[in-house]
Amino acid sequence: MKIVSTLLGELEFEEEDIIMFPAGIPAFEQEKSFLLIAMGEGVPFYYLQSALNPELCLVVANPFAFFPRYSIEIGQEELQRLDCSQREELLLYVILTVPQDFRESTANLVAPLIINQESKKGLQFIATNSDYTTRHPIFQPTQAEEQTGIAAAEEG
């Protein structure tokens, strides 16, 4: 199979690479099939590219790379929807908002994506009673930046 992504160019994939989101993703409910593509080896960032819509590509990340204590409580209903028999089958990602200055990127910690890597089913879980935000900065300012309000100049 093949799709020409607006962001990523031509992508070839097999049907077993497709992750199905039976309920879609809020704001993209009509989109049900996606590809999870690593941005590079050893980095926590991924593309979540629609398998049908070349213009729909989200940037997602492993939340634990930025928020080691991040946790959500997944109920039995969600586990059943994912055809999950063991929690070890699950992968967790958060959708990022990436502005022009990548250092200002934020993560939606309220509504992570949960993917069963065995069944290839996914859903967006909406956490209730959470202290998390939908725009949590993933890069923390350095102590000097916090004290002065001035970011360090980029080298190069």
From Swiss-Prot:
Entry keyword set: Bacterial flagellum biogenesis, Chaperone, Cytoplasm, Translation regulation
Biological processes per GO annotation: bacterial-type flagellum assembly; regulation of translation
Keyword Nucleotide-binding: no
Superkingdom classification of source: Bacteria
Localization: Cytoplasm
Keyword flag Chaperone: yes
Cited Pfam families: FliW
Principal location class: cytoplasm
Quaternary structure annotation from Swiss-Prot or TrEMBL: Interacts with translational regulator CsrA and flagellin(s).
Family: Belongs to the FliW family.
Protein name: Flagellar assembly factor FliW
Lineage: Bacteria, Bacillati, Bacillota, Clostridia, Eubacteriales
Encoding gene (name): fliW
